[in-house]
């Protein structure tokens, strides 16, 4: 037996138009064999697709399924459908890539290039020698042949029944989905393309948008004789039992795989793939790589890899398809040409209960999420048609190949890239969806005008931070837990304003963990959130209006202006929106709340959302400053860290306003402050007793009101309350006072003394931070050396409340300090109001995301004229989180229903 000939050369010459059974294009290929002969063959793109699928199934290692770097099988040019492009344009654009594919294929090692599948694909078939004649098989039942009109544009069909793919070359369908038809085959299997993939699907699950049914009724004289090649047992009353070898008359054909036949005087339906024309070959269920280029009834002997027997033996009984078909036994005929798994299988029957052409299902409502793809690590390609990229770039996925490689486009470049370097973010869609739309290139340049810093920061982080190689390692993502839709858009303005206004109060603390910086950030996230500069300006104006109008709304009792000096520095960064850097130790998956959702864990930096208002992390881990009420991140444990009780809130709260002064921490600080206070306060006994809240309230001396205690303390030390807090820092300072962090109890004692409205008095934390960072544009001088008086920053929590009203006194105290430690006069009160207003203005109303935030009181709180009292265990719904440390809440249980401002350090996230 002479040795089998091998392929020497393959050249794709051109494309040719065919009209039978419907309009399509085939590639003209010249094949030179080792025997010296040169032959011309014609193949459709779908045949190449089938060959590729067969190759990848047969040679998984060489196809890069296990290790993309070991792939040697060339990539089949992706689906270049260009939406509704003319078919010829698509075919021509694929011409050179298909030629390169063929050349690369035959240059592979012999065990691949000379394997049966490849040789069969390039062998000449009867249809190559005698191309189909231009004749109509019959006339369509309705609508006429819409595809006969030039220019040829891909037809679109609507999915009327769900279908779950059963082979790698197939794709799954969902009712209402719209697909582009690339090839209609009489086997009943059509080659289609969706937004992201292409493959074979049963035609019975589709219906033309124009009502055309692709059915041909044959006139009596046109009826053709066919021979049954596989036995078939009817599964429905209108089907026919077939015996191998029987000759039947086909009276009605269609492209859905089921033909009406007449046998022994009876009429019924039979699978077209079980029949063969008396003079022809069996019709394959789906054109395969080895099948002839001509699709349709003449597409007779291709072996489609789609016909894998395993798992195909059983046909999925689809309710929509009436479950009329089941697995057929593997045909024993045609065995020599087909591998055991390559067998024919009819598509499911069409569900006749669904009226044809009427009320086609509407496309599914776009999922609640829109998908965007980004590169998660740097990649340098080693293949000619690959693409190299950096981490954090937005990607347009043109084709998802089962091999693990995706054909992508980044800006104006495209090529193959390993799917493991690309991840998907799902953007929660809502009324503000536009906020998530990525700006167009020209919009990006505009955006840069107002946020050059932000962009710089984003890209910088991407370049600077060592990008994480693969998505394996989860990265913590810092985000505001609430939907960013509202603030994101304006986050830039907010940040800008924040830095300019109260640098610290509105600013977001930027997490500046060096560790976090290492994580790659995804700049695109920011762009995708901010739609346009105009929008930003509009936001800015809106915010300004809000600030002005905000006065009337209940103000946080004693807004603590950004006491933390250092925090303020971040504001500048805030304006750039430095990417929030989560602690390395914090790894968690993005959540939908954030508007993101990804399969692998990503670093906050990677996500780089504008949302994350950079929260600069104070050395002491001050509570995150709350961005304009940016939704807190539920996942993000507020860095406020372990404040006694506040800690929980930090968890959800997004960065708290610097004003907040770590209210959460406050609590802890207060407590610790107690002990430290003693030392700091020169041993004021009562204050020591005051304990927990001492830091802020400096426990009141026995005979004094809370306000007084502070005054006295301040006076004794010769420091203004603020200064005291500065000194107190040790206690409040998270770092200084670990104990405070750990001790959540303070609140309980505090309640007795009136926890000193921590938010106002909490300056201490700031103090601590102040030492580490410059006070954010603090109105008053920072405490210098702890001894210098801290200029009363309006928001500093240290104000000594007028004896009776701790909150007011606090704020007053802070301001009084400015004037003089002891001035707690009514004047202070007025100032407090100002502070509140400022803080309120600084805080961004964040009602949207807070509605579902439930918090529980961790201690009893005694209110004053501006605030209400509540008991430990009371459940609140947080409506707004103010950077001052005061949150506007509504009581849900444990007390009569009321709304008002309460200190956040008395709350913790409800489990």
Curated annotation (Swiss-Prot):
Residue numbers bearing the Phosphoserine modification: 279, 291, 499, 528, 843
Record field: compositional bias (Basic residues): 338-347
Intracellular or extracellular location(s): Cytoplasm; Cell projection, Podosome
Positions with biased composition (Basic and acidic residues): 311-337, 486-499, 517-548, 571-586, 598-609, 618-628
InterPro entries in the record: NADPH_Oxidase/PX-Domain (IPR051228), PX_dom (IPR001683), PX_dom_sf (IPR036871), SH3-like_dom_sf (IPR036028), SH3_domain (IPR001452), SH3PXD2_PX (IPR037961), SH3PXD2B_SH3_1 (IPR035477), SH3PXD2B_SH3_2 (IPR035478)
Function: Adapter protein involved in invadopodia and podosome formation and extracellular matrix degradation. Binds matrix metalloproteinases (ADAMs), NADPH oxidases (NOXs) and phosphoinositides. Acts as an organizer protein that allows NOX1- or NOX3-dependent reactive oxygen species (ROS) generation and ROS localization. Plays a role in mitotic clonal expansion during the immediate early stage of adipocyte differentiation.
Family: Belongs to the SH3PXD2 family.
Medical condition linked: Frank-Ter Haar syndrome: A syndrome characterized by brachycephaly, wide fontanels, prominent forehead, hypertelorism, prominent eyes, macrocornea with or without glaucoma, full cheeks, small chin, bowing of the long bones and flexion deformity of the fingers.
PANTHER family per the UniProt record, alphabetical: SH3 AND PX DOMAIN-CONTAINING PROTEIN 2B, SH3 MULTIPLE DOMAIN
Free-text note regarding domains: The PX domain is required for podosome localization because of its ability to bind phosphatidylinositol 3-phosphate (PtdIns(3)P) and phosphatidylinositol 3,4-bisphosphate (PtdIns(3,4)P2) and, to a lesser extent, phosphatidylinositol 4-phosphate (PtdIns(4)P), phosphatidylinositol 5-phosphate (PtdIns(5)P), and phosphatidylinositol 3,5-bisphosphate (PtdIns(3,5)P2). Binds to the third intramolecular SH3 domain.
Protein name as it appears in the record: SH3 and PX domain-containing protein 2B
Organism this protein belongs to: Homo sapiens (Human)
């Amino acid at each position: 037996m002479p040795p089998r000939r091998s392929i020497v050369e393959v050249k794709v010459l051109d494309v040719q138009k065919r009209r039978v059974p419907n309009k399509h294009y085939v590639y003209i290929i010249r094949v030179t064999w080792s025997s010296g002969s040169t032959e011309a063959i014609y193949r459709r793109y779908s045949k190449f697709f089938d060959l590729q699928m067969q190759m990848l199934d047969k040679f998984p290692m060489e196809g890069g399924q296990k290790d993309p770097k070991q792939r040697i099988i060339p990539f089949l040019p992706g689906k270049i459908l260009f939406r509704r492009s003319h078919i010829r344009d698509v075919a021509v654009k694929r011409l050179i890539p298909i030629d390169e594919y063929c050349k690369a294929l035959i240059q592979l090692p012999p065990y691949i290039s000379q394997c049966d599948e490849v040789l069969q694909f390039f062998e000449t078939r009867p249809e190559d020698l005698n191309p189909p004649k231009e004749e109509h098989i019959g006339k369509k039942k309705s609508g006429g042949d819409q595809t006969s009109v030039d220019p040829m544009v891909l037809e679109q069909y609507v999915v009327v029944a769900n279908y779950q793919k059963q082979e790698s070359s197939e794709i799954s369908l969902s009712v209402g989905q719209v697909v582009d038809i690339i090839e209609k085959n009489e086997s009943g299997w059509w080659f289609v393309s969706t937004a992201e993939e292409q493959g074979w699907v049963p035609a019975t699950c589709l219906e033309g948008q124009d009502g055309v049914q692709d059915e041909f009724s044959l006139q009596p004289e046109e009826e053709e004789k066919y021979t049954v090649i596989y036995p078939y047992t009817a599964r429905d009353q209108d089907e026919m039992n077939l015996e191998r070898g029987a000759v039947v008359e086909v009276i009605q054909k269609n492209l859905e795989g089921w033909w009406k036949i007449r046998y022994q005087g009876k009429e019924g339906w039979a699978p077209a793939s079980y029949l063969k024309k008396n003079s022809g070959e069996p019709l394959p269920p789906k054109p395969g790589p080895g099948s002839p280029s001509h699709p349709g009834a003449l597409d007779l002997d291709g072996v489609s890899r789609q016909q894998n027997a395993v798992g195909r033996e059983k046909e999925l009984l689809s309710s929509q398809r009436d479950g009329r078909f089941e697995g057929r036994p593997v045909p024993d005929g045609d065995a020599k040409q087909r591998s055991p798994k390559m067998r024919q299988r009819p598509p499911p029957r069409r569900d006749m209960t669904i009226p044809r052409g009427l009320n086609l299902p509407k496309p599914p409502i776009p999922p609640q999420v829109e998908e965007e793809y980004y590169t998660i690590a740097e990649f340098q390609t080693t293949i000619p048609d690959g693409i190299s990229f950096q981490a954090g770039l937005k990607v347009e996925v043109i084709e998802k190949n089962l091999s693990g490689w995706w054909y992508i486009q980044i800006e104006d470049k495209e090529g193959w890239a390993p799917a493991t370097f690309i991840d998907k973010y799902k953007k929660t869609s809502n009324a503000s969806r536009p906020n998530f739309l990525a700006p167009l290139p020209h919009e990006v340049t505009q955006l840069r005008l107002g946020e050059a810093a932000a962009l710089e920061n984003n890209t910088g982080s991407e370049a600077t931070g060592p990008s994480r190689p693969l998505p394996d390692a989860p990265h913590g993502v810092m985000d505001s837990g609430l939907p960013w839709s509202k603030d994101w858009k304006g986050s830039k303005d907010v940040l800008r304003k924040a830095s300019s206004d109260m640098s610290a109060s509105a600013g977001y603390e930027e997490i500046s963990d060096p560790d976090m910086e290492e994580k790659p950030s995804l700049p695109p996230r920011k762009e995708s959130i901010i739609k346009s500069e105009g929008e930003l300006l509009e936001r800015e104006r809106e915010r300004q209006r809000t600030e002005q109008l905000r006065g009337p709304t209940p103000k946080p009792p004693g807004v603590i202006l950004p006491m933390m000096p250092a925090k303020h520095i971040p504001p500048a960064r805030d304006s750039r929106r430095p990417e929030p850097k989560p602690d390395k130790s914090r790894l968690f998956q993005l959540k939908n709340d954030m508007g993101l959702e990804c399969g692998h864990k990503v670093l906050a930096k990677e996500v780089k959302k504008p949302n994350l208002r950079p929260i600069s992390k104070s050395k002491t881990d001050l509570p995150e400053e709350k961005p304009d009420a940016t939704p807190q991140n539920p996942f993000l444990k507020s860095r406020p860290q372990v404040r006694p009780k506040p800690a929980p809130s930090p968890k959800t709260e997004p960065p708290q306003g610097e004003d907040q002064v770590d209210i959460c921490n406050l609590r802890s600080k207060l407590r610790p402050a107690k002990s430290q206070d003693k030392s700091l306060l020169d041993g004021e006994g009562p204050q020591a007793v005051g304990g927990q809240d001492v830091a802020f309230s400096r426990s009141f001396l026995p005979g004094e009101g809370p306000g007084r205690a502070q005054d006295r303390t301040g006076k004794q030390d010769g420091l203004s309350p603020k200064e005291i807090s500065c000194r107190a820092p040790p206690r409040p300072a998270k770092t200084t006072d670990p104990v405070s962090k750990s001790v959540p109890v303070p609140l309980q004692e505090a309640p007795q003394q009136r926890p000193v409205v921590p938010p106002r008095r909490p300056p201490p934390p700031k103090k601590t931070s102040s030492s580490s960072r410059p006070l954010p544009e603090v109105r008053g001088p920072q405490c210098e050396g702890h001894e210098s008086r801290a200029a009363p920053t309006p928001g500093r929590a240290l104000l000594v409340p007028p004896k009776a009203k701790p909150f007011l006194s606090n704020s007053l105290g802070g301001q009084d300090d400015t004037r003089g430690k002891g001035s707690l006069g009514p004047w202070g009160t007025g100032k407090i109001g100002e502070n509140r207003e400022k803080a309120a203005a600084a805080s961004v109303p964040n009602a949207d995301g807070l509605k579902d935030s439930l918090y529980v009181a961790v201690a009893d709180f005694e209110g004053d004229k501006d605030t209400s009292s509540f008991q430990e265990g009371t459940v609140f719904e947080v409506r707004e989180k103010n950077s001052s440390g005061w949150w506007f809440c509504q009581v849900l249980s444990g007390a009569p229903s009321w709304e008002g401002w309460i200190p956040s350090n008395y709350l913790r996230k409800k489990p």
